[in-house]
Every structure is written in C-alpha cells, then in structure tokens.
From Swiss-Prot:
This is Co-chaperonin GroES. GO terms for molecular function: ATP binding; metal ion binding; protein folding chaperone; protein-folding chaperone binding; unfolded protein binding. The gene is groES. It is found in: Cytoplasm. PROSITE patterns: CHAPERONINS_CPN10. It comes from Bifidobacterium adolescentis (strain ATCC 15703 / DSM 20083 / NCTC 11814 / E194a). Belongs to the GroES chaperonin family. Together with the chaperonin GroEL, plays an essential role in assisting protein folding. The GroEL-GroES system forms a nano-cage that allows encapsulation of the non-native substrate proteins and provides a physical environment optimized to promote and accelerate protein folding. GroES binds to the apical surface of the GroEL ring, thereby capping the opening of the GroEL channel. The keyword Hydrolase does not apply.
Length: 97
C-alpha cells in the first residue's frame, strides 16, 4: 500500500491492525468496548532525527515491517478516507517476526 504522506524526522506512519470484533467464545464486541490495537504495518518512515553534529540518526524500522507500538503513543489521523497512526520511533516497542 502506497500513501502520499511523508513523515518528518523520526516519525513513522502505521496502518493499524483491525480491532477484535468477536471473543474466542463467539460473543460480538461493541465498538465502544473494543481494545485499541497495538500493532500494525509500517507504511512510511521519516529520515530520522539529527544528532548534535547534524548527522541523521537512522530509524530502526522499514516500510512493510509489522510492529508493536505503545498503547498510548502516536496520533491518529484520517487522510483520504483512511485511518493512520503517526508514531515516533521511540514509541515502537518491537518488530514482529
């Protein structure tokens, strides 16, 4: 999936995974009770922050990585009919294998 958003510095654009809609026992979960997803796919990565010498510090993730991120990290944005999450690199907890 390609998007026309370019993140700045160490920002990362993530397409959030869908929240669970049904429990293991078959009960449907109403929208207001769904857990906020903490994983998704990286769609775009900024060039990284600059250190004191002005050199770029590379970001550890790349486009296509499946990541786990902080539950309250990031900013949800709605752009061209789609929902995205913009997070800082420090809010990425792990790359899923």
């Amino acid at each position: 999936m390609s998007i026309s958003l370019t993140p700045l510095e160490d920002k990362i654009i993530v397409k959030q995974a869908e929240a669970e809609t049904q429990t293991a026992s078959g009960l449907f979960i109403p929208d207001n009770a769904k857990e906020k997803p903490q994983q998704g796919e990286v769609l775009a990565v900024g060039p990284g922050r600059r250190n004191d010498a002005g050199e770029r510090i590379p970001v550890d993730v790349k486009v296509g990585d499946k990541v786990l991120y902080s539950k309250y990290g990031g900013t949800e944005v709605h752009y061209q009919g789609e929902d995205y999450l913009i997070v800082s690199a420090r809010d990425i907890l792990a790359i899923l294998g």
